[in-house]
């Protein structure tokens, strides 16, 4: 804390030291990231957001990393066996993951990335929530598969994600809705 003071005066705030100014000074200037609102959307389930945050930081223990540390015999993706298990592969290129994301996008009638960037407010929240749920369930299934050596069909996982997204939309939805959102929500109700 010594560098916050010069000649007995508090540098960060001309009014002097306060708990708030001290806390802000200790935090420092953190660069903002473009994906913050995508991961930490208040409609998302917190444990899903946490996994999303780990994914964005590439901090999950993937087989590629474990293989380099000689903790596993291969680095092959356990879900599709088509490439090394990296963050990019598991959540973007893996055929198993792509199936889940595609089925969710078909149900929601919107590409998740497009909905997050360009959708109505309701669609942005719902797409962020669906994205985090997909990533969470993919990671959960990957871990179950490593332990139990059996893989659940993507349709079963999609059913769970759809139920969760549908329930949470109904919890957070605020009336009145835009006409486009009314039609969209009715479509989700019909297909859930």
Each predicted region: which residue ranges?
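A helix-boundary/hinge signal
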Residues: 1-192
């Amino acid at each position: 804390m010594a560098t916050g003071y010069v000649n007995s005066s508090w540098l960060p705030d001309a009014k002097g030291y306060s708990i708030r100014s001290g806390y802000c000074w200790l935090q420092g200037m953190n660069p903002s990231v473009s994906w913050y609102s995508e991961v930490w959307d208040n409609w998302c389930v917190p444990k899903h957001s946490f996994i999303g945050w780990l994914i964005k930081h590439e901090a999950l223990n993937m087989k590629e990393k474990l293989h380099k540390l000689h903790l596993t015999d291969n680095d092959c993706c356990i879900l599709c066996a088509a490439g090394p298990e990296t963050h990019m592969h598991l959540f973007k290129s893996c055929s198993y993951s792509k199936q889940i994301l595609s089925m969710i996008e078909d149900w929601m009638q919107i590409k998740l990335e497009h909905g997050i960037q360009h959708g109505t407010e309701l669609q942005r929240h719902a797409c962020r929530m669906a994205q985090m749920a997909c990533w969470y369930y993919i990671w959960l299934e990957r871990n179950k598969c490593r332990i139990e050596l059996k893989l659940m069909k993507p349709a079963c996982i999609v059913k769970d994600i759809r139920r969760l997204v549908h329930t949470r939309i109904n919890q957070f939805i605020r009336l009145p809705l835009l006409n486009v959102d009314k039609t969209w929500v009715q479509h989700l109700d019909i297909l859930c």
